[in-house]
């Protein structure tokens, strides 16, 4: 699974975008990046499966996970 991280403003303007192949590297980056800032960064993380589809969308305030939403495909 691939993890695409966006650091965003309150208006969801993108500050940085990074991709991680490993969930532990993603968490380590969030912890280190939050510790380095004088403000609490906001993150949006897309979890992408092997087929290239988005499975989950997560939001964080600093290191605190605010929400995790499962993305469901609707087929007519």
PLM region spans:
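Short aromatic-glycine-(Arg/Gly/Cys) micro-motifs in beta-strand/loop hairpins
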Residues: 1-14
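A short, exposed loop/beta-hairpin motif centered on an aromatic-Gly-Thr core
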Residues: 12-24
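Short, mixed-charge low-complexity intrinsically disordered segments
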Residues: 15, 32-76
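Short amphipathic alpha-helices within nucleic acid-binding modules
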Residues: 26-29
